[in-house]
């Protein structure tokens, strides 16, 4: 553990700040790179220490639970083949998620794994019969499907329900999973346990918002309102990168006397990985003080943090520390390392890791095909993309299809990407919007506007629900085609949809275009709509907004006060940018007038 703190202290990108900091009330969003502080959280350099975050005094005298919430939606080799997955391909996006499931280099892939609940059900290579019954009948509520299931005299034991729940969660079918928990609550099939309440809390937070989740906690019997319930709420605040509320829950867990766990610290690492990397070392020191050992997920978060900062040396030091502590790299960790080597241009190192992942027989390690396709596509290795896809082609799995379409797009083989898409259409009577979305992204990347428009029409005609990922691709398509009015109209439709929340990138495509034009009015409009949609003001969002004023040569009245109100403090770069739009700046002419 001490070695980990030293590795982080040696890194400029992850400076260890003053550790006399405190347990505070937190508040910040996703994935910025060079962030100055955006919240009333820890400020390392000069601002006064704010209320309590990391007093480094979490009482560890309480008994500890052995629940491992780091599991849950693990991506394993048990993804179902498409022939058994028609219902999955047909599933519309039932939740708004800020993660882009089709993105091959999603830095937060491990975050999703860490935030899911463990249901203590062994994974099966085939969907449960109850799961099939729930999703196979379109237009039928989950309650009706389960009523019919009971009428037919089929199994209604806890294991059957939990297996179906795991399948629903694994496929991110959170709306149906929530309906299932509501039906169980009404029909009292078995006695509720804390994990059942935690599962429902998680689904309510995902589908209806964290504020509804917090309201639900008040209805949970006090005897079941334990650590698992609160850390589930914490994970959902972290998933939305809401620093203020995440830190508030973290502090409340301390106040309630819950023992600090590695899972809880991992959640804070995920949060700070996205919003303020300088705080990561403080979390590690807290782990050290409480004698908690980092687990595999801790190391994966740190590997991803270093890799996404392009600190490959630091990433390799984390891996060496991990090995010295006796923690073995799993295949998912290796995939993460390979991706970061690839994005850093270290082709040979990336390919070496990929070969290690593949082992002696790719057929036996079939579950790695998705990652192999993804990274080989990024490396422009057409021969390897084709070799891996050939193994999957006859009976492809869902994630392999998404990865293959994107990989062929990366190597500029659009016809091959289209062929994979057509194969899926033939194999399934209905296709998930995600499959359309990844092909649409290929069209966007290749500026194939007419093909993209045709695909959107085809998707609409098929009756597919359009999710956040698809709206994002459509908006980008119109922006790059110069049809900004249509892009903004699409954003409005996405906002008005009650089923999804547009991705932040959907707003940013339009903001960047208006900034390029020096259009302050419309840049401000999109900035405000982004806040109204529930996204907190972020450092780089203000950076973009201020650039609109600079490009328009217009004064940015009150900008400093607005930033201060959002707890955003400029770094040197932003301060210089702000000075250019300062309405009261001195010029040679103003000096003469003075």
Curated annotation (Swiss-Prot):
Residues 62-109 are annotated as: Disordered. PPR repeats lie at residues 226-260, 261-294, 295-329, 330-364, 432-466, 467-502, 503-537. GO terms for cellular component: mitochondrion. Belongs to the PPR family. P subfamily. Signal peptide: none annotated. The keyword Zinc does not apply. Residues 62-75 have a biased composition (Low complexity). It is found in: Mitochondrion. It comes from Arabidopsis thaliana. Disulfide bonds: none annotated. GO terms for biological process: mitochondrial mRNA modification. Transmembrane segments: none annotated. This is Pentatricopeptide repeat-containing protein At1g15480, mitochondrial.
């Amino acid at each position: 553990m001490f070695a980990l703190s030293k590795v982080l202290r040696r890194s400029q990108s992850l400076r260890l700040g003053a550790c006399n900091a405190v347990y505070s009330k937190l508040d910040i969003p996703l994935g910025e790179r060079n962030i100055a502080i955006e919240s009333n959280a820890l400020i390392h350099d000069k601002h006064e220490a704010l209320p309590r975050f990391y007093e480094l005094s979490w009482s560890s005298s309480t008994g500890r639970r052995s629940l491992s919430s780091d599991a849950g939606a693990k991506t394993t080799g048990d993804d179902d083949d498409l022939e058994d997955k028609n219902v999955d391909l047909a599933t519309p996006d039932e939740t708004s998620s800020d993660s882009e499931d089709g993105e091959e280099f999603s830095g937060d892939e491990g975050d999703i794994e860490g935030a899911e609940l463990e249901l203590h059900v062994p994974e099966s290579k085939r969907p449960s019969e109850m799961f099939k019954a729930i999703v196979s009948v379109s237009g039928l509520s989950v309650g009706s499907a389960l009523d019919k299931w009971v009428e037919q005299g089929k199994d209604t034991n806890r294991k059957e329900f939990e297996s179906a729940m795991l399948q629903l969660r694994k496929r991110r079918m959170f709306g149906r999973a929530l309906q299932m928990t509501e039906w169980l609550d009404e029909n009292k099939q078995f006695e509720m346990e804390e994990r059942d309440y935690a599962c429902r809390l998680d689904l309510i937070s995902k589908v209806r918002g964290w504020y509804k989740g917090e309201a639900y906690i008040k209805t949970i019997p006090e005897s079941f309102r334990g650590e698992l319930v609160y850390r589930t709420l914490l994970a959902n605040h972290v998933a939305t990168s809401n620093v203020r509320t995440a830190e508030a829950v973290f502090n409340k867990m301390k106040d309630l006397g819950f023992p600090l766990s590695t899972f809880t610290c991992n959640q804070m690492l995920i949060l700070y990985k996205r919003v303020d990397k300088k705080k990561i070392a403080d979390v590690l020191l807290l782990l050290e003080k409480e004698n908690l050992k980092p687990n595999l997920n801790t190391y994966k978060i740190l590997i991803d943090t270093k890799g996404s900062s392009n600190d490959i040396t630091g990433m390799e030091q984390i891996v060496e520390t991990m090995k010295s502590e006796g923690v073995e790299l799993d295949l998912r960790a290796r995939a993460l390392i390979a991706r970061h080597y690839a994005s850093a241009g270290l082709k040979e190192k990336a390919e070496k890791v990929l070969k290690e992942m593949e082992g002696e027989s790719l057929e036996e390690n079939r579950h790695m095909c998705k990652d192999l396709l993804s990274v080989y596509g990024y490396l422009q290795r057409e021969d390897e993309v084709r070799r891996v896809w050939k193994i999957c082609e006859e009976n492809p799995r869902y994630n392999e299809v998404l990865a293959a379409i994107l990989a062929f797009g990366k190597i500029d083989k659009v016809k091959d990407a289209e062929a994979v898409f057509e194969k899926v259409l033939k194999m399934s009577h209905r296709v998930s919007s995600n499959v359309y979305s990844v092909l649409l992204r290929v069209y966007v990347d290749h500026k194939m506007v007419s093909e993209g428009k045709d695909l959107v029409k085809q998707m609409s005609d098929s009756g597919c629900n359009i999710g956040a990922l698809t709206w994002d691709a459509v908006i980008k398509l119109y922006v790059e085609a110069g049809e900004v009015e249509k892009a903004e109209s699409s954003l409005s439709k996405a906002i008005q949809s009650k089923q999804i929340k547009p991705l932040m990138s959907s707003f940013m495509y339009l903001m960047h275009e208006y900034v390029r034009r020096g259009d302050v009015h419309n840049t401000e409009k999109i900035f405000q709509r982004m806040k109204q949609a529930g996204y907190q003001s972020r450092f780089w969002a203000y950076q973009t907004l201020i650039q609109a004023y600079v490009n328009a040569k217009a004064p940015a009245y009150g900008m400093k006060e607005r930033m201060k109100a959002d707890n955003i403090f400029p770094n040197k770069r932003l301060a210089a940018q702000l000075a250019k739009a300062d309405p009261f700046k001195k010029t040679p002419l103003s000096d003469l007038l003075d």
